[in-house]
Amino acid sequence: SSDLEFSIIDRYFKRTSKVDVSLGIGDDSAIITPPPSQQLVICTDTLVAGRHFPLETSAHAIGWKSVAVNLSDIAAMGAKPHSILLALSLPHVDEAWLAEFSRGLFDCCDQFSVSLIGGDTTQSTQLTISVTALGWIDHGQAVTRSGAQIGDYICVSGQVGDAAYGLKHLGHPLQQRLDYPTPRCQLGQQIGRAHV
């Protein structure tokens, strides 16, 4: 780890964590105290510039989306999102871009009561963002794909295809659905509690 890496972390990504995070950003690993009778749900998504978002996407939108796509996966399992880890690979350090990216990331974290508890930054030839999200669910209550049975209902929330349309028609109002997806965290938890 370099002085530049620690400077980026301190300036753009270090914030107070939840009370159950005994050790967060700044050490080699984070330490979390798990709630009783809960299971940990973990997922990771990687976003690559030019593949998962257009190169001209605002840094704020990229920050938001990098968190939101992971929270959607946590919600799909019926879990309550808790925290994220961020691995950020940058082609160059751009202070204005980092400020907007971190603002978008924390705007999404704050809206869904999620803490950034660690991660890594490095330099690379291409902008790549990997977020790992952690959530909690009551033991044995996860909604899994493999748990689906013949006769079960398959439900979709939101409008299918809006983000894809926004990608093909940049500048159209539906691009907002591509840039700022809305994780259905409350709905996911309700489905999980209902044992659906």
What are the language-model segments listed below?
Residues 2-193:
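Helix-biased detector of long, well-ordered alpha-helical tracts
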